[in-house]
């Protein structure tokens, strides 16, 4: 960024400022739970993106997403392996069951670009 200030006598001064973008993490959390008619017992979550060596991807899911304090279950390894998750939580305090997913990506020591492109899946 270059700033030039000039006065009425045509004298000027210039300042140059350099900004460096340093994004080291990104987090996503659904704001609204996906509605469920009955207690969800299993889910499959897939995440597309670029996850080079040195970065850390963390993923959590809950089946009581309408609760004031949902019971988050770590599904990071199952997402990385493309495996189904069976919920351990069997309780809710809200009127209805609902599924939420949240993910966090940390740059860590990665030297390549890392990003989350999409999050998808299903539950039953």
Region spans (language model):
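Beta-strand-rich ligand- or partner-binding modules
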Residues: 1-124
């Amino acid at each position: 960024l270059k700033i030039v200030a000039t006065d009425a006598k045509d004298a000027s001064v210039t300042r140059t400022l350099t900004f460096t973008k340093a994004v080291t993490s990104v987090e996503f959390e659904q704001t609204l739970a996906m509605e469920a008619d009955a207690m969800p017992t299993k889910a499959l979550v897939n995440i597309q993106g670029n996850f080079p060596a040195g970065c850390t991807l963390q993923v959590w899911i809950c089946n009581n997403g309408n609760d004031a304090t949902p019971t988050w279950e770590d599904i990071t390894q199952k997402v990385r392996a493309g495996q189904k998750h069976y919920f351990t939580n069997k309780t809710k305090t809200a009127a209805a069951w609902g599924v939420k997913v949240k993910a966090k990506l940390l740059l860590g020591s990665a030297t390549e670009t890392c990003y989350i492109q999409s999050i998808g899946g299903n539950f039953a």
